[in-house]
Amino acid sequence: MAATLLDVCAVVPAAGFGRRMQTECPKQYLSIGNKTILEHSVHALLAHPRVTRVVIAISPGDHRFAQLPLANHPQITVVDGGNERADSVLAGLQAVAKAQWVLVHDAARPCLHQDDLARLLTISENSRVGGILASPVRDTMKRGEPGKNAIAHTVERADLWHALTPQFFPRELLHDCLTRALNEGATITDEASALEYCGFHPALVEGRADNIKVTRPEDLALAEFYLTRTIHQEKA
């Protein structure tokens, strides 16, 4: 029988540096308003009553996290992350070994809306596999010729989606799929790809396209705009 309305834990891999931001500070510690990007991302998870614990995987040499109010939050657990995202997620899963369902959310994705999170969490009512937030591709997509800055052909976009986070899976299933994929040398770009590698087909839950990941310098201003707009809407 599928689980229903269970408390869930979340894992936030935050051990990366994000060199495309062209800053000396890891992007998750850049500020938007009076909070870091990491704080915005984590608080969006904790705002939902079903999310009872968040495990944050940080770099072993990270000295910034201890300076944040999150470091003393009663619902936050910190673990050492690994060299790759999948290693950090596995470390987080080890810390919530008794959890049945787990969210995984990008540390640098601060604009998560509560209605999107709520719809994603309903998956646990009737699924044994889980699913992800995703946004349908709207732009025309081109595949490039290998090694050249030239178009090979246009890619049909009808069934293409941008993968977002959070991604939501049974904890044991995600752990087993990540472990197998890593052991077999598979390329894992997100948690869903580990399940795909093992033959599962997670659900696509349409989410808002403004749930962006801060990756490049120009994303910071865009995320600030989205967050400010959301705050104003909530106060209205």
Curated annotation (Swiss-Prot):
InterPro entries: IspD (IPR001228), IspD/TarI (IPR034683), IspD/TarI_cytidylyltransf_bact (IPR050088), ISPD_synthase_CS (IPR018294), Nucleotide-diphossugar_trans (IPR029044). The record marks 157, 213 as: Positions MEP for the nucleophilic attack. The keyword Nucleotidyltransferase applies. The keyword Signal does not apply. Pathway: Isoprenoid biosynthesis; isopentenyl diphosphate biosynthesis via DXP pathway; isopentenyl diphosphate from 1-deoxy-D-xylulose 5-phosphate: step 2/6. It comes from the Bacteria. One of its GO terms (molecular function) is 2-C-methyl-D-erythritol 4-phosphate cytidylyltransferase activity. It is an enzyme of class 2 (transferase). One of its GO terms (biological process) is isopentenyl diphosphate biosynthetic process, methylerythritol 4-phosphate pathway. PROSITE patterns: ISPD (PS01295). It catalyses: 2-C-methyl-D-erythritol 4-phosphate + CTP + H(+) = 4-CDP-2-C-methyl-D-erythritol + diphosphate. The record marks 20, 27 as: Transition state stabilizer. Its EC number is 2.7.7.60. Catalyzes the formation of 4-diphosphocytidyl-2-C-methyl-D-erythritol from CTP and 2-C-methyl-D-erythritol 4-phosphate (MEP). Belongs to the IspD/TarI cytidylyltransferase family. IspD subfamily. This is 2-C-methyl-D-erythritol 4-phosphate cytidylyltransferase.
